[in-house]
Amino acid sequence: MCSSDLTNPFKLEGAVERVLQNFRDRELDALVAIGGEDTLGVAARLYAEHAFPVIGVPKTIDNDLSGTDYTFGFDTAVFIATEAIDRLHTTAESHNRVMVVEVMGRHTGWIAVMSGIAGGADVILVPEIPVDFEEVAESIRKRHARGKNFSIVVVSEGCELPGLTDAEERDQFGHVILSKRGVGDALAREIEQRTGYETRVTVLGHIQRGGSPTPRDRVLATRFGLKAADLAAAGDFGQMAALHGDDVVAVPLAEATAELKVVPREWYDVARAFFG
């Protein structure tokens, strides 16, 4: 089991110099940085500012790195979230409840959209699209009017809800610690107040990030690892292994971390077609 650390060396005095010195002291030839936007952002800066021999491998359940079609970890997270939504359907229907399912996704709603579509959610809320409480409530009311006395609402933890202020606590990358925000709870309260329907919350949290990976993620991680080894052997540093279509290719770390890959409006419209 590999350990991990969210320390940002560029935020700590002397930390970058220690990274460089430790690398030299151990007589290493290359570093493979495995992670998401924060980890690979640090890797990109180390390469750009210090010619550090680093290769990137995209690992994040958020699937929000623009340089690759998919990151490994994402498929597993979607599978876990979809299974949870499937299971919550039965208790929602038997108790005539609205079930709010909060999934991970700080800046983007890939997990919410994919698991919501796969699990048959009635409303899906993502950070890319502003949340309208009344629109959500009306969708649920319409279901009840048609005799559907239960609803499943999937919401990304990073959604901006009207009136919800961010918690003060942040990590070393400047991100709000989302577990302190309570997006799912705030949304559930609003739904219950506006509709009068009993509403419950399930926060999937870190269960999405652990356990056995799906076969797709296992294969993708293996392919990324092989590509990273080839790049290191060739001395082709400052690159990230990426999936483009069915091919694993190399893309510059700077390009891969320049911007986030957000959920396109078209994907959200696919999900929206099934709302209510």
Predicted features by range, described:
Residues G67-V78, S212-R218:
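Short beta-strand elements at the ligand-binding edges of bilobed clamshell
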Residues T7, G36-T39, V57-N63, E128-V131, ...:
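Short, ordered loop/turn segments at secondary-structure junctions
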